Amino acid sequence: ALFDIIRGSIMNLYKRDYIKSVPTKQEMQLYEGILCTERKAVGDRGFGKINHRRLYPAAVRHYDSLFPNNHIELFDFQNEGNMEQLNEEFCALIHDANTNERNVLRFINHRPAYHIIAGVFKYYNFGHHDAYVFPEFALGKYIADYLLIGKSSGGYEFVFVELEHPNGRTTLKSGHEGETFRKGTYQIYDWKAEIEAHFSASFVTITKYSNKSSLPKEFSEYDSSRFHYAVVAGLREDYNEATYRDRRNKVTQQNILTLHYDNLYDKACELETAQSF
């Protein structure tokens, strides 16, 4: 499989190290042949631009990105041909009463099924131009379960994701947030404080996952409007009108998106036929 985590190197999504292993001569020849075909098609038509990116060798696409070993493209997941199977396995997992958040993390990271967590991009307006997934990203003394980095025409933005128990005390009888959601929210408060106080130190480690001599300014100049947070806990059945009201308030007041695991499943299913994240 193209998507496979390297044991002991959680930050690398792939078997191949796309930083150390540069595109081969054969891969570059294939790439240049496709570029030639694109130019010829434009010449015959006389206008516009032809892009056959889906045909470019993966090594070329990843190596050319900001973070080669964390770069994702939706059509790669789709070409694997097992998205539907993975989605149904995920659905069964989250609805198993014995499943906890570590089981979910293990499934996404080691099955692997990164498109499931990348589905969080569908709640935002970035990620369709460029997208990255970093599992277990260190923020000082804290660890975010996932950091998603996505690009739109406005540049790069960041989503820190915390996974909590799918079958824990998610909500109270009233529908308001229970212990599980509060735990995730408190964790995000700590992340926010760490990023705001030590942005440069928090983000300096990300440079070692890049093969570029410099990164866009979004990675060195803190802009709170580019930072987003998400907590995933519980299932659809745990939510009622009060829960959804709390959810709306938390997004508008604290920039924290609260999701249940069925939301992840729904978005993962949408990605089976989507054009972009």
Q: Positions of the model-derived regions?
A:
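Charged, terminal alpha-helix-loop-beta segments
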Residues: 1-277
